[in-house]
Design a protein with these regions (language model features):
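Conserved beta-strand hairpin/beta-sheet module of binuclear metal-dependent hydrolase folds
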Residues: 1-39, 116-134, 147
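Short, hydrophobic beta-strand segments that form beta-sheet elements in well-ordered domains
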Residues: 24-27, 49-51, 69-76, 88-89, ...
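Metallo-beta-lactamase
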Residues: 73-126
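Active-site environment of divalent metal-dependent phosphoester hydrolases
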Residues: 11, 54-59, 80-81, 112-113, ...
């Protein structure tokens, strides 16, 4: 199984996971034209798309994806907020299958109607990817995970130095996004014996530091795990 990030920020998010036979688009938060340019794929080449929540940096071209005839999966709350029809409604803990990939949605914690993360398990190679972005924390443990793609949005010490940041913005960050030490503590609680790579998602332009975050995560996980920051 392969994970790839094409956009990962508050300006837009788009990722893919593929196991050779199935190619799934994770989020569609950039323009349709930009998605095709960055990924190198036309809409028709995606088996399906999953959307975590309704915020535009994760969903702005969902109409184009639906119009292209690609199945789109999201929670009922997300579909209602986006006011879209013709999508596949999924819920926490209810497994579904796309091609050769079994997918399990799980609840996340964000200022959205019904946000979800997703676990992907390939029937082709048995690998497991956990995808969770835009969440203040995670309440679940995932045994047998091969790859983690997870939010690492801000550092509380850097945030504290942003004296001119409006209090409303500061409050939203701390109550809906994952702080780097929270992530590290979560990773320490996991059995990562089967994990080969961790991807850090959605790093803030103003309140994160890519090199610092990578080093902190390396200190929190076993030595065999590779850490990659997806900051474009």
């Amino acid at each position: 199984m392969r994970f790839e990030a094409f956009a990962s920020s508050s300006h837009g998010n788009a990722y893919t996971v593929t196991d050779g036979g199935t190619r799934i688009l994770l989020e569609c938060g950039i323009s349709h034209k930009k998605l095709q340019k960055l990924s190198g794929f036309t809409t028709a080449e995606f088996t399906a798309c999953v959307v975590s929540h309704e915020h535009k940096d994760h969903s702005c071209c969902v109409g184009d994806i639906i119009a292209g005839g690609i199945p789109v999966y999201m929670s009922e709350g997300t579909a209602q907020e986006l006011e879209v029809a013709g999508v596949q409604i999924v819920s926490h803990g209810e497994e579904f299958t796309v091609g050769s990939v079994d997918i399990v949605p799980f609840n996340t914690f964000h200022d959205a109607r019904e946000p979800l993360g997703f676990l992907f398990r390939s029937r082709t190679d048995g690998e497991v990817l956990v995808f969770a972005t835009d969440t203040v924390n995670l309440a679940y443990r995932f045994p047998g995970v091969t790859m983690l793609a997870i939010e690492a949005n801000y550092d509380k010490e850097i945030l504290a130095r942003c004296e001119r940041m409006p209090e409303k913005v500061r409050h939203r960050i701390t109550n809906s996004h994952m702080e780097i030490e929270v992530l590290c503590n979560y990773l320490r609680s996991l059995d990562l014996s089967t994990c080969r790579e961790i991807y850090l998602l959605h790093l803030s332009d103003a309140t994160s530091h890519e090199g610092h975050f990578i080093n902190k995560v390396y200190r929190a996980v076993p030595k065999h795990v590779k850490v990659t920051a997806c900051s474009r």
